[in-house]
Structure formats: C-alpha cells, structure tokens
Amino acid sequence: MYPLIRRYLRRIDLFMLLLCAACSVLSVVVLMSIGQTQLGSNNKASVQLIASLLGMMLAAVFSTADYHALARAWPLHGVVAWGLVLPTLFLHNVNTGLLTIGYDAGGTSNYSWYRVGGMTFQPAELAKISFILTLALHLSRVRGQVNRPRNLLLVLLHILLPVAAIHIQGDDGTALVFLGIGFIMLYAGGLSHWLAAGGLAAGIVGGAALLALRPGLLKGYQFKRILAVLTPDDPALADITYQQNKGAMAIGTGGLTGQGLFSGEHIFVPNAWNDFIFAYLANVLGFVGAAAVLVLLLALCLRTLQTGLRCPDALGCNICVGIFAALFLQCVINLGMNLQVLPVIGVTLPFFSAGGSSVVMMYLCIGIVLSVGMNTRRSKLDMQRII
C-alpha cells in the first residue's frame, strides 16, 4: 500500500495539486466571509468545501487513467454530456416534481440548468470536458492535414455545433468560452496563420455587421449590458450597471491590504459569491490578495500548458491546450467583467466562484492534465530503461 502511494506521489505533479488546493482554500475562506454579510450565501462555503474535496478525489482517480482511453471513450461521455444538454434546448422550467429541466437560475432566459431538490447542476460544464476530449482526438487524427478543406470543414462543424447548442440554451457566456476553446485548439493543432487571422477578422467584422443590421438578435438585457460597459454612468441603465459599478468601486477602494476578511467593512457587491468574487476579494484583501489570486491562476494556466508541451504525442498536447484555453478564457472574461471592460455574461472565476458542479468539473480537467503528465513521465522512464 505505502510503496504504491510513494510511487504515485513521485510521479504526480504535486505543484499543480498545491496550486489547486491553495485556490480552493482561499475560495472557501472568502465565501465564509461573504456568508457573514450577505443573505442567501450562508451555505456557499460548505458546498464549495464539499465540492472541492470531491473534486480532488476525482482528480486523483482520473490522474491514474490513460487519457488515450478517456478520449476514445467519447461515445460514452459524449452521449451522457450532450444527452443532458439537449433536453434543455426545448424544455424550459419543466417541473417533474423533484427535478426541474431547463431551469432558469438567474431569470435571464438562460435555461441551461437542472434543479434537483435544492441543488442546481449545469450540464454544459460536463459537456465542456467532453468537447475538449473529442476535439483533441479529432485534431490528433488530422495532424498535419487540418488545412485541407474537407478536414477543416469537419473540424469547424465539430466546434460550431456545440457552440450553437449552448447558445440555444441561452448561455452565451459559456458559448463564447466554447468558441474560444475551439479556436485556440484549432490554431494549436496546425491551422495556418493566414487562415487563423482571416477567420478571426471575418468573425469579428461579420458579427459586428450582423448585429448592426439586425440588433434584434440580441435580447434586451444583453444589449443593455453592452451599453453599460460603454456608458457606466448612464442613469437609464442604473439597474444594469449597479453590480458592475459596485464591483469596480470595491476593487478601487481595497487599497494595499484591503478592509479585512470577516470585518464587515467591505463595499457591498450584489451576489459577490458568484461572478464578482474577485471584486469582493480585492476589497477585503487588497492589492496583495488580488495579486496572489492572479499569480495562482496564471501559474495554473502556465503549468497546464507546460504539461501539454512536454507531452510526446499530439492527443495529450491537444487536451492540455484545450484545458489551458478553458482556464485562461474564463479568467480573462471574468476579470474583464469585474474591471468593467467586458459586459456581464455569467462567466465564473475558476476554483473561486461558488458553484459545486463547476468546481468538480474543473478538478476533473486537472485530473486529466495530471494523467497526461504522469503518462509522459512513464514514457520517459520506459525509454530510459530501453536505452
């Protein structure tokens, strides 16, 4: 038993695990502080703690799995993940007693949730993992030939169909993350620089032109959230800008060391436990605490990318690039929301924002990255023995 544990600890990336554990511990402490002052948040810390512990155990299990087998098992996890997503495209707030399908958690026509009793679950988080695994497998099979028209068309369909499904749910923030993950993985998988630049430019210009010609494509609250970033002091948008203005104020008044955890002297930020936990954290822990969080998340992103670059095969590299993209994009979008440079689109801060399903799924992603790292080390040891 003990020799197995020692061998496991020698092979596992302890630095990555420590980074994740540090994020989780800080998240639970901050949520406990929020729970003292905001109604409806008193159980967030305990749920986060349980989800983090469960996630760590699942990460340990997945780290011992062969990531090749996980990717090849796409008929299993793909059917489960998208089988949970698809009903929410058509069933909205359908209550079957204990279960509510297509639950609109925030009252913004985002029907991407299931509600079971008093708990909610977002299947798009599980679909995100399946999406990364299947796209990584697809790209590894067309390695060196991704720019051929037929291959490129099939990869684009692989990316855009899931994005469309998440958009139909009403969760445009997650759809944007899916799109970003797909583009980064495609570019890292060999898409030519000219096609990447042209596609990105065409997407931005085409999207802007489409919205200008048909503004009705945006829901009313979405259009107002964009205007709120451009004109945050507009009295007509006070109900939309209130949370972001409070968040920016909280960050600006945190000072060097902040107002202090559990002090009750922080700037009030509505629903601080969710999308705006960074603003609350910057207010109570100041610049020092905010910088520490950014360093932890940046180190985690870079470690994930480093693991992929060290992997000798395309599949492992593609998987790590996809998980890096998910982490990085969520961090950038969430920080942009908190700093009032991006509209509020419901993207949470990985490992910090309250949410049991998102925390568990993020740990599953880390477990897969650890699997890539462990298999890479095993391959190097086997090669050394052969030599």
Regions found by a protein language model. Give the residues of each.
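Transmembrane alpha-helix boundary/anchor motif
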Residues: A65, T134, A208, L217, ...
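Hydrophobic, glycine- and aromatic-enriched re-entrant/interface helices and adjoining loop segments
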Residues: A105-W113, G198-A292, P312-G316
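Membrane-helix boundary/helix-loop-helix interface segments in multi-pass membrane proteins
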Residues: M1-L18, C23, V29-Q169, A325, ...
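Hydrophobic transmembrane alpha-helices of multi-pass, membrane-embedded glycosylation machinery
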Residues: A175-L186, A202-I204, L298, C365-G367
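Interfacial segments of multi-pass membrane proteins
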Residues: L139, L176, I181-L195, E265-G289, ...
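Helix-loop-helix junctions and helix-breaking kinks within/between transmembrane helices
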Residues: I34, A124, L153-L186, L213-G216, ...
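Hydrophobic alpha-helical transmembrane segments
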Residues: I50-G55, A127-K128, N283-L302
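Hydrophobic transmembrane alpha-helices and their immediate junctions
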Residues: V288-C331
